[in-house]
Amino acid sequence: MGNKQKLKFEFMRGFVAIAIAIAVALIFIFICADDPAKALNCLLIRPIISNGALNVSSILTILGRMTPIIFTGLAVCVMFSANQFNLAGEGTVMAGGFVAALLAIYVPMAAGLHPVVCILVGAVVGGLLMLIPAIAKVKLNASEMVCSLMLNYVVLYVIMHFLSNVFADRSQGSTQTYPFLETAKVAKMVPGTELTWGFVIAIIATILVGFFMYRTRWGYTIRMIGINESFSKYSGMRVGGVIVLSQVIGGVLSGMGGAIEVLGRYNTFLWKDLPGYGWTGITVAILAKNNPLAIPFAALFIAYLNRGCELMSIYAGVPAEMIDIIQAVIFLFFAAEQFMSKTRQKMVVKETKEELAKKQQEAAVEGGNA
């Protein structure tokens, strides 16, 4: 199958998977909602249009919620490109956010420098955490999927211990840290909304990751190892080092996303569970077909649905967890290798017949000229 046909098939496959996911969601909406029409309006239209006018506040909320899942989507994109199914994005997001929060509370700095240092340290912490499953994979041949999945819960419980017993603000009714210093916060692009300058950083990160993956030797090596690890090894590529590199880059991006989200959206650190951005990043990367430059568009789609489900919960009484159902169905059909395999086979046969007919026609023309 040629590149054009392959792209056409993948687009068709993605569209059908999303359509099925929306259809499944519609079934649940008709079961749960007292007014299905109102619920559908909240899900599909109200995120951008409310009462016949552009819903600017909601649009800015969507853009703000894109920020962390762009980072986790990029992280998963790099790791999956190397065929490393690392699932520690959840833990690294939380760890990056927690460490950044501690620096934002206890280490005073100048206003312009403070958030930068917090974000960079959060990114480093994320990268260091990802070394654990990466080294276990390379040195011990351990499954990076299992190691990273367990790492998420180790990180969660360690953070909860320190949050509850060491850094908690006892004057508050819930478990949370002391407020961040004003100098440490990531500034809002539009005051009073969830949209921060972290969104701009996320777009810059997208461009840099795209350049790294498609315009550098290291990016090429990561993609080659993902396609065929054995061939890459026999070709002289440093497979072990690149496997570690891909996962560390994923950790850096996830940790950075967690730090930006915490310092931009909250006044204190109050996560008491894994935030969910790591799992959403997997869906985003799958939708983008591991193409870094497509990550923001996939993130926009998920953030839009997320906002729609939130509005549906507020105004139509449908559980906001509907977004989890949609993501799960999308993941299911994208992960199923045999999904639409017959359609792919028909496209291959059709393309082959067309090529043969074209060659026969060219041969007939050449024979006539002779």
What name fits each language-model region?
Residues M1-I20, L26-F30, I227, Y234-G241, ...:
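Cytosolic-side transmembrane-helix boundaries in multi-pass membrane proteins
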Residues G2-M12, F80-A88, A110-G173, R215, ...:
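Short loop segments and helix-boundary regions at transmembrane helix junctions
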Residues A19, M66-C77, T92-F98, V124-L131, ...:
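Hydrophobic alpha-helical segments embedded in the membrane of multi-pass proteins
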Residues F28-D34, C42, P47-Y106, G127-A142, ...:
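Single transmembrane alpha-helix segments in multi-pass membrane proteins
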Residues D34-K38, F80-G96, V138-C147, Y266-W279, ...:
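Short, non-helical or kinked segments that cap or interrupt transmembrane helices
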Residues P191-T268, P292-L293, F297:
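Helix-loop-helix "hairpin" substructures at the membrane interface of multi-pass membrane proteins
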